[in-house]
Amino acid sequence: MRFIIGGAGSGKSQRCLDELTQAAQAAPAGPPLILLVPEQATFQVEQALLGSGRLKGIIRAQVLSFQRLAWRVSLKAGGLALPPLSDLGKQMVLRALLEKKRDDLRLFHQVADKPGFIERVAGSIRELRSYRQGPESLRRQLSQLEAEGLGETSLGAKLHDLALVMDELRSYIEGRFTDPDEYLTVLAARLEESRLLEGAEVWVDGFNGFTPQELAVLGAVMRSARQVHISLCIPPGQLYKAGGHHSPSDLFHPVLSTYDQLMQLAAESGVAVDPPLYLNEPLRFRGAPELAHVERYLFRQSAPAWPGAPERIALVEAQNRREEVAAAAREILRLVREEGLRFREIAVVARDLEGYGDLAATLFAEHGIPAFIDRRRTVAHHPLVELLRAALEVVVQDWAYGPVFRYLKTDLTGVSRAEIDLLENYVIEHGIRGRAWQQQEPWQYLRRYTLEEDAVPAGPAQQALLDEIHRIRRRATAPLLAFQRRLQRRGRPGPTVREITTYLFQLLDDLKVARQLEAWKAEAEQRGDLETAREHEQVWTRVLELFDQIVEGLGDQVLSPKVYLQVLSAGLDGLKLGLIPPGLDQVIVGTVERSRHAGVRATLILGATEKDFPPQPAEDAIFTDRERERLKQSGLDVGPTSLERLFQEQFLTYVALTRGSDFLWISYPLADESGRAAAPSPVVGRMRRLFPELKPRPAAPPAPDAEAAVAQVATPRQLAAAVARALRRARSGYAVEPHWLDLYQCIVLDPDLHREGAAVLAAVGYEEWLRRRGTPVGRELARLLYGDRLVTSVSRLEAFLSCPFRHFAGYALRLQGRAEFTVSAPEFGLFYHAALSLFVRELERDGLAWDTLTPDEAWRRMDSIIDRLAPRLQSEILLSSPQHRYLLRVIRRTLQSSLDYLSEHVLHGEFRPVAVEVPFGEEMDGLPPVEVDLPGGGRVLLRGRIDRVDALEGRDGRWYVRVIDYKSGRRDLRLGDFYHGLTLQLLLYLMAVVEGGEPLLPGTRVPAGALYLPVYDPVEPVNAPVPPDEVRPLRRKRYQARGLVSDDPAVIQAMDAAGLGLIQAKLKKDGTVYKGAPVASPDQFRQLFAHLRRVVRACGEQILQGEAAIAPYRLGPHTACQYCAYRPVCQFDPAVEPQGYRRLEKMDAPDVWQRVAAAGGEGDV
């Protein structure tokens, strides 16, 4: 045996390749020449071996990993008698075994169902096997603990459970499979007798350490081969520490320990050790002395400072990871364009690849950089994996909403996304779940917008919708229903694993999944996305292999679909794809230990923070560090502790910093992904001590001027992004420099630039912003939408005056939010209105007066009404679940409490309800519409429905009219809001009855009031217990009717004869009204009505002219955007466009009275 000793960059790997190549050239036929490397490096080393051009092919020379060598030995011995049990198969078997032995487990049964636990158990068993530990050694350690009285500790429970599981696993595997975890053990035992390496020369390269299993194999290799060369990354000057003279904190401690182990192994194997070959010169850094300085001195206690600023090393700090990766992309393009590097000569290293991998894939693609993310990618969210999981969950969870639509949205079911959206909206609206999916009859659920009549048949449009829903449902569920029927066939104990797996494959076959994946693969190849193409291909192959493993491992066992789902999920969770780099010239993004970068000239290290570089290894999920140390002291080595792994990470940091030959670029974010401050790695401090003039530079230039912005531009898409940022400032009211507008015109006019930048500019919405700020929809389009006669409602006018675009989106485009099967504020309001209206109508029908009813009689009537209305609300939603039945109790309690206080208005007042749910408007069976003529000849016709009209006939024969609007909460009529058109409804209803109420109240009608009546069950906060006789007055304040009433004391007296505070207006002892009360004289009512007409006229004119601007109001702290459903459509951003608000003047009642009095009955708003 001979060691090849040298530090990073000294040419160890190249020396191994050169010696192997020379031997192969000298004697093309002869004993094997084997280069033994880590599994993940085999592809890149083979490329390097053949890429030199000195070998035209491989005959003697072989690049092998330990696993591949084991396979060669078994092949020479006649092959594997039994199929191997893959890692995924083992996880699924473990899942079933844990379920089977659940009652015998001491600890694992508590966490067996947690995601990832099975994978951790499988990993622990693999680690134990690699350290040549079995259930016997675990039980010996458990017996030792029990002798010390510690058998019931957590460590004892873990040893017991692991030994039990390993025993069960071995019993299960025996005679059925071979265990890949035992391959190296078998290899060590059989290698010598196989004579595979007889006369062979072996080079071992790329390892920093070996497991006990691998050391046993190396011992057999030493005894079998003619010559073994082992390269180790140890600077020759550090080798004096070998033989146990190094501490765990020493940088090269992991490799020196490996050297010691190999020397001991050679001695035990009777193998002579030749003098080492020392490689003293850092050949890699011949053209970059700064990097040689890093390799030699970075981790030394004392080191000379580098004179001057290094030209080939950069430190970069970024605000966040995204900015950091974007800066790395720009640096890669600079290296390629200015330094002449190829993409394949650039390595990007991240210790936290999970945090950087997706960002690198996205941003590098945006910059046009070909890149391969070197990681085993999980496919847990691939549509095929999701389909399998969801299909089983549908059966197990009895067609719950989530699994059904996860199944449908995989795009593998033959149903289009538009059809799925239609079906999903219908299902959500009507709360469909469970057996309703399995019924043969078409669904007939329809939403009702009134509760006061029995169900009516579906109209033509509704029936067409129901027919379409039925067609989609039948097509979407037919294969899944067939799968369920196969699973649930009666007359047998239950399906076996083999049968369930067969049924799943039949489902995939029914859906033609293989054909769809092939089509996706072809599409990906056509657009040049080779990684995705291979992913679609591999995931199908791996799923079929998974099915084979399930059947081979558990085939004839009877499992319930629920347990089978758990077993399959364990396999799917561990399903990862290792993709070979699809291109020859591309940047490799990976971790230090996984990616082998040959011929790297530039290394970019991302995420050099205190937390991640080197990372702080977490404790193992099974054995804690303290438990590992205790076991090691007792003679049971189960692997390194987190502290030992931290020392290994320090060595890997050294490897990462010395990987590139020409350039080193280190970056770190100042904040993590959660926004918390992140400190730079200690490595950054060491670099600055080595290079005092090395200063961190910002990833993005801080100045917002054009030169700094353009300095960040590397691609047409980035140019568009820079222009978009500048134009977005225009939306905030700032001036835009002329050169940005010039660049904008370049992007719009240049076909290539526009193709790349159109999406970015569309996202910022600059063109749309210009359009909506400058021009309305237009009179012609408005005429098509509305006609010359604008028939509308007051709520629509309020929406327009709140924000014109809100009106346009809701009433012109008719955009609606998704209707859901839930009881929210609108449904509560609908129920309350219906119940109170029906209460009054039935009193009238039965010839009863409200004030003659006792509270109990009134409540019995209301209780009966609630029972009749409850099934009518949204397909019996109030009876559909315990949660909704509780809401019905809330409704019942609210109406009981509200009815009690509403009755006081009848008992202590003279106004009586004359009609409820009073319609007004064209083609409505009620009062005529409120009509307002427009200057251009058009007309606005207002319609609506008034909750309740009360009246009192005066001695003069005139009708005093009061309108009531029920509200599910306390509401005030603020005259300032009315003046601006934000709350027109209540006073417009009063005007509709006063001016057009002849069919209801013949004669002269006088406005007496417009009031909001609360229907709710408030809680009154108090500071101390309240006597029973004071409770009612306190609650009565909460039920007070609020609004505007006549200033006539007689009218106020008629509304609250007992002075109980039923309304806001109160009379003094002398019969006059208190100052500041919300009252109006007849003239003031006329002035309000005149103002109302002016608002309607102005509003109607703008609507018919096509006004649809995004111009939300702001009035004090309130804005139109607070509860607007259309914000995702308009994209109005208050933080970016504060100047975009239409600011309204805050006005109190005196201000309003002054304005409307000055305007009189004429003029504009």
Curated annotation (Swiss-Prot):
Q: Which HAMAP family match?
A: AddB_type1 (MF_01452)
According to the entry, every stretch annotated as the UvrD-like helicase C-terminal domain falls at: 282-597
Q: What remark does the entry make about the cofactor?
A: Binds 1 [4Fe-4S] cluster.
Q: Residue limits of the UvrD-like helicase ATP-binding domain?
A: 1-324
Q: Give any Pfam family that matches.
A: PDDEXK_1
* Gene name per UniProt: addB
Read off the InterPro entries from this record.
ADDB_N, DNA_helicase_suAddB, DNA_helicase_UvrD-like_C, P-loop_NTPase, PDDEXK-like_dom_sf, PDDEXK_AddAB-type, Restrct_endonuc-II-like
Q: Which PROSITE patterns match?
A: UVRD_HELICASE_ATP_BIND, UVRD_HELICASE_CTER
Q: What is this protein called?
A: ATP-dependent helicase/deoxyribonuclease subunit B
Which EC numbers characterise this protein's activity in its record?
3.1.-.-
Keyword Nucleotidyltransferase among record annotations = no
Q: Which cofactor does it need?
A: Mg(2+); [4Fe-4S] cluster
Q: What is the protein's quaternary organization?
A: Heterodimer of AddA and AddB.
Looking at its record, which EC class is this enzyme?
A: hydrolase
Outline what the protein does.
Answer: The heterodimer acts as both an ATP-dependent DNA helicase and an ATP-dependent, dual-direction single-stranded exonuclease. Recognizes the chi site generating a DNA molecule suitable for the initiation of homologous recombination. The AddB subunit has 5' -> 3' nuclease activity but not helicase activity.
One GO MF term attached to the UniProt entry: metal ion binding
